[in-house]
Amino acid sequence: GTGKTHQAVLTNLPKNKQVFQTTLTADSSATELVGHYIPDGDGGFEWNDGIGMKAWRTGGRLVINEIDHAGIDVMSVLYAILDDPSVAKFTLPNQSKETVKPKKGFEVIATMNGVPQDLPEAIADRFSVKINIDTVHPEAIESLPENLQYAYSKNLAEDEIPMSIRAWKAFAKLSETLPVSEAAEIVFH
């Protein structure tokens, strides 16, 4: 709820840079990053790059949410994807065994709710900058309906642990079809 993904996707994004985004869980598969075969419509199969390889090929931005939730399968691929671009390469498990290298401009931003020490040292070391985001991005607050922006700011000032901006957006949406008291009961209790 503080807008980490919002900031990761939009902050300092060059005009034509593509963004590829995923949210990891313990059950996420490396195929999400590397790729896999899909039916081609003619009874055969064709290779489909995962978002990590797409970001490499285009010099795009790869946003990895909840990186600290990555399982062993994904973590093994992250070591390669996050390696120094001057030496990074990955041989795809496709028919041609193609070797892919990151195109100039490739960048990775990872988010997590934990602390950097929650990551394996070799992964944490691949991020030269670590930023603690403990306030909501102003644009995220501005995305709330005007009548809720003040209420959110008041909640932020009064509560030790404020409700996430996501909860306030859900409240705003429910308030369109339900009485405010019912929407508040559903979202905030």
Where are these regions (language model features)?
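C-terminal regulatory/interaction module of P-loop NTP-utilizing enzymes
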Residues: 1-189
